[in-house]
Amino acid sequence: MGDNTTVAPGTNQTLVEEDLGAQITHTLMVQIMSKLNEMLTEYQPQIIGIGATVLAIFVIMFISLLIILGCNCIRPYNFKNLKRYITGKASKSVEYQPLKMSAVNMGMDEDDEFLA
């Protein structure tokens, strides 16, 4: 028999001893997993906080997008014209006009001055 084989007690079966590399790999994996588990339990509140913050940012961005695209308080006909313009169903008289900033649009009288 070779150096790396043994006979199982009470049987005639030959067992091959574990390779040293496999033992080292197993030991390293156990140490790495225990260290990861330790770090996760230690930093769990921070990880959950960061995840919740990122999720909240995405939810706020999505809701803001819905509000911006579905807002009828600015100029509802501009969004309808934009949709027709993009889809190519706009007639020659209907073209998309971007919103213009003016004192009248902002609810100011024409004689009011902008504050610097």
UniProtKB/Swiss-Prot annotation:
The chain crosses the membrane at residues 47-67. Glycans are attached at N4, N12. It is found in: Host membrane. Residues 68-116 are cytoplasmic. It is a single-pass membrane protein. Keywords: Glycoprotein, Host membrane, Membrane, Transmembrane, Transmembrane helix. The keyword Ubl conjugation does not apply. Residues 1-46 are extracellular. The keyword Transmembrane helix applies. One of its GO terms (cellular component) is membrane. This is Uncharacterized protein ORF80.
